Amino acid sequence: MNDSTDAFVSRIAAYPWPRGGVAVERARGGYTLYSQRTGAPVARLKPAGRNDQVQLFWRCRDTWATPGDFGPVILPLDEALDFIASEGFFWIDA
């Protein structure tokens, strides 16, 4: 793991998550967040190549999808974590 990967994992793990928190797994060029309480997938973050920007995905019918109807959601990591924590649809199975 390089330094930026370690920083992403540390920042995700340190976030004050609701519903018992998340576990972070690095996989296929991104980060998958799982509910620590249920083990269910919560979200997937994929670096967007600009500073700490990430593309955001949610679990929908056993696949990863972009939230909303307007294409990719790309946010700075801190804003993406806030969005995941505050939007209930990420936590349906968590």
Predicted segments — roles?
Residues M1-A7, W58-A94:
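Mixed-charge, Lys/Arg-enriched low-complexity segments
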Residues M1-R37, T63:
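Negatively charged, low-complexity tracts enriched in Asp/Glu with abundant Ser/Thr
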Residues V9, V22-V24, V42, V54, ...:
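Extended aliphatic helical segments
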Residues S35-W58:
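Short, conserved beta-strand/beta-arch hydrophobic-aromatic motifs that form part
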